[in-house]
């Protein structure tokens, strides 16, 4: 009876493993993608592929590092995400974080985003009590954005490099000479472009026909005029956690 049970359990295990293998093989990776991936990451192991919105995404390990790479179906590389330690962050990023509003929060995870033709971005996942935020920094320590991490999704697909129209590129070059373009995305018919200009992160929004709509930047609470700060402090929201 025991031998029979062991045999049955072994068959079940084989069935589960076969099911997992079938799931993995269900993603058809184009030859061009496989060739590009092999050339970029010759030491990759434990490779698993997934189709995410038309992008071929590989999760793998290389030199002991957990990584993820994004390609289109033609084999063009877009982005690589590397799981790194806090100590591996550029000094400018560590300095900015430790001098910022989240310095007392626990750093749960750190990712490095290498992107085709655009700025390298570092993402710190920080948490305190029930709150979690993703903090995006440029290589020279500029805080680009702070996003509540409500669903625990570690996918940084929204940071894939996007091509800008000539009208938008020309406007940014004229209005913000020397600006570095960090990210761009389409949202509700508008194009939102994140740039670094004069050492600050700006978000520039364009509407129909790529016409400029507005530009905004975040400021620290200490930079807010006293009258505004007092009004906020006396409001129902208080000053426990305000993003301006």
Region locations from a protein language model:
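Positively charged n-region of N-terminal signal peptides that target proteins for export
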Residues: 1-4
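Sec-dependent N-terminal signal peptides
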Residues: 6-10
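C-terminal motif of bacterial Sec signal peptides marking the signal peptidase cleavage site
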Residues: 16-19
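Acidic/polar, low-complexity intrinsically disordered N-terminal segments immediately downstream
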Residues: 23-83, 87, 94-95, 131, ...
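A low-complexity, Ser/Thr/Gly/Pro-enriched, surface-exposed linker/loop concept
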Residues: 30-31, 72-105, 144, 150-158, ...
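Amphipathic N-proximal alpha-helical interface segments
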Residues: 54-81, 121-149, 189-217
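A charged, solvent-exposed segment within the mature domains of Sec-exported extracytoplasmic proteins
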Residues: 112-166, 170-174, 178-180
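Conserved small/polar residues in nucleotide/adenosyl-binding loops
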Residues: 242-244
């Amino acid at each position: 009876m025991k031998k029979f049970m062991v045999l049955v359990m072994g068959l079940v295990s084989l069935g589960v493993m076969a099911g997992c293998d079938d799931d993995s093989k269900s993603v058809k990776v184009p030859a061009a993608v496989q060739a590009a991936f092999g050339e970029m990451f010759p030491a990759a192991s434990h490779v698993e592929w997934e189709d995410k919105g038309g992008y071929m995404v590989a999760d793998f390990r290389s030199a002991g590092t957990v990584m993820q790479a994004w390609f289109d179906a033609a084999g063009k590389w877009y982005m690589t995400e590397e799981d790194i330690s806090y100590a591996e962050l550029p000094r400018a990023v560590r300095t900015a974080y430790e001098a910022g509003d989240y310095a007392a929060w626990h750093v749960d995870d750190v990712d490095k985003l290498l992107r085709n033709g655009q700025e390298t971005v570092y993402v710190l996942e920080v948490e305190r009590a029930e709150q979690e935020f993703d903090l995006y920094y440029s290589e020279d320590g500029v805080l680009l954005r702070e996003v509540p991490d409500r669903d625990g999704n570690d996918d940084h697909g929204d940071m894939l490099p996007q091509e800008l129209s000539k009208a938008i590129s020309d406007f940014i070059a004229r209005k913000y000479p020397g600006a570095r373009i960090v990210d761009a995305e389409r949202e509700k018919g508008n194009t939102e472009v994140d740039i670094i200009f004069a050492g600050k992160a700006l978000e520039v929004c364009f509407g129909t026909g790529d016409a400029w709509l507005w530009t905004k930047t975040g400021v620290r609470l200490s930079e807010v005029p006293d009258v505004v700060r007092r009004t906020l402090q006396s409001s129902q929201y208080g000053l426990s956690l305000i993003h301006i």
